């Protein structure tokens, strides 16, 4: 007669303990990586280096640097476009590296319940 309850293949308490330990390790790794990423900064330029924007891992703009040549009072729109482009590129770099870092940790899930693709 088949046993009811429990997981196929046996020792449920041991398997659950191992899963919990693995989940706790992974949570700690993700917390550590998140703190590490928040302390980092990413930089991007636009207009051939005329505009440089630096963002943090907290998704905050840290600095905007403009070369004198790009500041034209008669063409403010171009300057605005360059700032937006550099900011978006810096944020894209940050997001890409953050996602890659989290996927390297979450990859251990092996798409467990579809969670492996969350990051």
Swiss-Prot record:
<comment type="subunit">
    <text>Homodimer.</text>
</comment>
<comment type="similarity">
    <text>Belongs to the YbaB/EbfC family.</text>
</comment>
<dbReference type="InterPro" id="IPR004401">
    <property type="entry name" value="YbaB/EbfC"/>
</dbReference>
<keyword id="KW-0238">DNA-binding</keyword>
<keyword id="KW-0963">Cytoplasm</keyword>
<dbReference type="GO" id="GO:0003677">
    <property type="term" value="F:DNA binding"/>
</dbReference>
<dbReference type="Pfam" id="PF02575">
    <property type="entry name" value="YbaB_DNA_bd"/>
</dbReference>
<feature type="region of interest" description="Disordered">
    <location>
        <begin position="23"/>
        <end position="45"/>
    </location>
</feature>
<comment type="function">
    <text>Binds to DNA and alters its conformation. May be involved in regulation of gene expression, nucleoid organization and DNA protection.</text>
</comment>
<dbReference type="InterPro" id="IPR036894">
    <property type="entry name" value="YbaB-like_sf"/>
</dbReference>
<dbReference type="GO" id="GO:0005829">
    <property type="term" value="C:cytosol"/>
</dbReference>
<feature type="compositionally biased region" description="Basic and acidic residues">
    <location>
        <begin position="28"/>
        <end position="42"/>
    </location>
</feature>
<protein>
    <recommendedName>
        <fullName>Nucleoid-associated protein Cphy_0047</fullName>
    </recommendedName>
</protein>
<dbReference type="GO" id="GO:0043590">
    <property type="term" value="C:bacterial nucleoid"/>
</dbReference>
């Amino acid at each position: 007669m088949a046993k009811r309850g429990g997981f196929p293949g046996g020792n449920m308490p041991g398997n659950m303990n191992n899963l919990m330990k693995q989940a706790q390790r992974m949570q700690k790794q993700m917390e550590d990586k998140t703190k590490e990423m928040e302390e980092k900064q990413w930089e991007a330029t636009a207009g051939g280096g005329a505009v440089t924007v630096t963002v943090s891992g907290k998704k905050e703009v840290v600095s905007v640097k403009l070369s004198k040549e790009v500041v034209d009072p008669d063409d403010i729109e171009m300057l605005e476009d360059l700032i937006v482009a550099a900011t978006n590129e810096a944020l894209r770099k940050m997001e890409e590296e953050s996602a890659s870092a989290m996927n390297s940790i979450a990859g251990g899930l092996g798409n467990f319940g579809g969670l492996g693709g969350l990051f």
